[in-house]
């Protein structure tokens, strides 16, 4: 094979060599598609959890697991495995093979989509690398994302396996949050890379006091979004959303009774239903106020430029929608459709925040 057609370091662009405009558009479009697929996976994960489908497949076969049961005998084998765990005996006893197939397909689709995403990342990566469209640094980064995607699959199984315990009918909240958090972290990394490939040079924004203050506020708001998503994971993992289905008070109280009943105190943030739900409500409110502060500061600062101000406006609208979705999900006692949309829109809100930060990266840069 010729040197040009190999995956050698010399066959890729030097990191100091800019990627051609045509290649930048193709590469970034591909990565944006991966991001869209990841949002779909986050939605599928939420639906799988909310329908109680996550424990329906009791073996982990990364390669052959892509093939679903093709015979009645195989369906019976899978169902027999599921009947051995407490979730079936306590929650689904007697729902039959047809009921099992319904939850099986939800979990199978979630795993199948993960495999599709792996191929959608790896195959174009090989092509772009072979044709010399990628820099060495970008090849290394994208290969790392591929490996982390595989690790995320292993973390998913680590989470699911916790639900097979004889004293459990669901996965452990900490493992659920780990799986969710890693998905969002990988999503942020790929999104930032896609944005940077599409627009490698940041537009200069003068570093005035107002501009710097706005950028700091956006950073704070973005961090709060991440923390609130994490708190939402614990709300989901502890099923806290099925309690205190009133708003703005929690059964007539601002701070629910029993908030600090566990010892040591910090355990309440992760295991105590009243505390977990209150914290998620509080963080959501603080996040909305922080984004409001970003809007107030940013729209009064014309030096930011129209792209950044437009992104701030989108953040404002997105957080209002997300807050309304959260209240709706709570008051309706977490129907699967509402919970899925709420989790998915959290990814949309985070996306807009990352785009806003990316548009602000040129502050003070010439």
From Swiss-Prot:
Gene: ctaA
Record function comment: Catalyzes the conversion of heme O to heme A by two successive hydroxylations of the methyl group at C8. The first hydroxylation forms heme I, the second hydroxylation results in an unstable dihydroxymethyl group, which spontaneously dehydrates, resulting in the formyl group of heme A.
Highest taxon listed in the record's lineage: Bacteria
Protein topology in the membrane: Multi-pass membrane protein
Assembly with partners or alone: Interacts with CtaB.
Lineage: Bacteria, Pseudomonadati, Pseudomonadota, Alphaproteobacteria, Acetobacterales
Primary location: membrane
Localization, UniProt: Cell membrane
Pathway: Porphyrin-containing compound metabolism; heme A biosynthesis; heme A from heme O: step 1/1
Residues that hold heme according to the record: 280, 342
Protein name in UniProt: Heme A synthase
A single Gene Ontology CC term: plasma membrane
Family membership: Belongs to the COX15/CtaA family. Type 2 subfamily.
Gene Ontology process terms (BP): heme A biosynthetic process
EC number: 1.17.99.9
């Amino acid at each position: 094979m010729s040197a040009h057609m190999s995956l050698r370091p010399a066959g890729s662009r030097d990191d100091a060599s800019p990627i051609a405009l045509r290649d930048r558009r193709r590469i970034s479009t591909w990565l944006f598609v991966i991001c869209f697929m990841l949002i779909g996976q986050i939605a599928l994960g939420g639906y799988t959890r909310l329908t109680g489908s996550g424990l329906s497949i009791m073996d982990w076969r990364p390669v052959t697991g892509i093939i679903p049961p093709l015979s009645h005998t195989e369906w019976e084998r899978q169902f027999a495995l599921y009947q051995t765990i407490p979730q079936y005996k306590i929650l689904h006893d007697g729902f039959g093979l047809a009921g099992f197939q319904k939850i099986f397909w939800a979990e199978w689709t979630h795993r199948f989509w993960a495999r599709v995403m792996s191929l959608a990342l790896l195959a174009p990566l090989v092509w772009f690398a072979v044709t010399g469209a990628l820099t060495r640094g970008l090849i290394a980064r994208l290969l790392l994302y591929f490996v982390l995607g595989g690790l995320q699959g292993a973390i998913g199984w680590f989470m699911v396996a916790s639900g097979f315990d004889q004293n459990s009918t669901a996965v452990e909240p900490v493992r659920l949050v780990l799986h969710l958090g890693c998905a969002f972290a990988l999503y942020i990394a790929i999104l930032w890379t896609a944005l940077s490939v599409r627009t490698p040079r940041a537009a200069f924004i003068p570093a005035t006091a107002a501009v710097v203050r706005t950028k700091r506020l956006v950073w704070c708001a973005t961090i709060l979004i991440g923390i609130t998503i994490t708190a939402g994971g614990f709300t989901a993992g502890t099923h806290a959303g099925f309690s205190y289905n009133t708003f703005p008070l929690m059964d007539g109280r601002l701070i629910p009774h029993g908030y600090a009943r566990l010892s040591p105190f910090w355990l309440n943030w992760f295991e105590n239903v009243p505390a977990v739900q209150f914290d998620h409500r509080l963080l959501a409110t603080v996040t909305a106020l922080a984004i409001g502060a970003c809007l107030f500061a940013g729209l009064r600062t014309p030096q930011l430029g129209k792209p950044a101000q437009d992104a701030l406006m989108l953040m404002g609208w997105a957080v209002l929608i997300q807050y309304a979705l959260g209240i709706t999900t709570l008051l309706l006692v977490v129907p699967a459709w509402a919970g899925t949309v709420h989790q998915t829109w959290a990814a949309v809100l985070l996306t807009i925040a990352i785009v806003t930060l990316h548009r602000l990266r040129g502050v003070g840069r010439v």
